[in-house]
């Protein structure tokens, strides 16, 4: 009888292991333009208590990425109740919803649509959207959260990794969490990883008056700070020029270097999503 019980327990353990571990672990990176891309917008700071973002803001960048060879599904995520023109919804919230909760909603969506099927994804987050991605990966394995996520690349555009003084201008929960040294930011792990590894690229701009150096203020394998063009906070997804005339400071883990003929932000995003060394 004991042998039967042990055999049954072992069978259950094997089944659970099969459920909790991907059939094809993402242990080795594959450079390609074939992974689904999830686009996550940032905060709506308006005082109208009717939070909304227009996901069509991503259209120019998405069109360029397709022209450059990305042929997998692209998802623009709705999380405010009044968001418009989004392809997919991960919730119906407002500005008083904690970024931790938004991270959970994103993690749950990725799990249900891709990770459970063994498919890795990439994420592009603008502003607070980058922190939502960070929160999604940081808490996997916690009670009620997905056990893991298959996220190969994350690119953050103008994300206040160390907070933004502009967040003192509003009083929503999300604004409070975006302030420098907030309890949320202090509790948020740096460089959180998906199953098999996640390659982070942080993109900031010296002309982004809301974020500036905070845009590259997290431990990451790749960081780039634009000096020219003069990207403001809403310009990151509007420059899809193929020109290689940008002035940047960039860091791939060996210190900061100046580069005066770099890719512009749209094409840099393409390379960051495609190549693990860029």
What function would you assign to each model-found segment?
Residues 28-278:
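Lipid deacylating catalytic domains
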Residues 1-28:
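Secretory targeting and sorting signals
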